Amino acid sequence: MFYEVRFHGRGGQGAVMAAQALAVAASHDGSSAIAFPFFGAERRGAPVLAFARFGQERLRVRTQVYEPHFVVVLDESLIETVDVLAGLRPGGTVVVNTMGSPDRLVLSKKAKSATVD
């Protein structure tokens, strides 16, 4: 089994670096891991996606993450403009970078949620 994580951020916020750091940390723990970005020619501040996939089995899948176990949102305002929970697996978790509590998040569907500042 492997885990899939999708990062939502804005250009320059570190979504790509966060995905890469997660993959490196997982590989140091003995897991197979891969991370990659998805963005076009947008400028700094435009929405970007990054993905990480890791697990004990050999990774053969090198596609975008469509059904993540975890979603990390680096800019809370993206929740209003992007369907950040699209494809989130049942029982999945969303982590949002905000000073607010998980109770005040307005999410498009039921999901486990956590906040971190």
Summary of predicted features, one role per range:
Residues 1-117:
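Active-site cofactor/cluster-binding pocket
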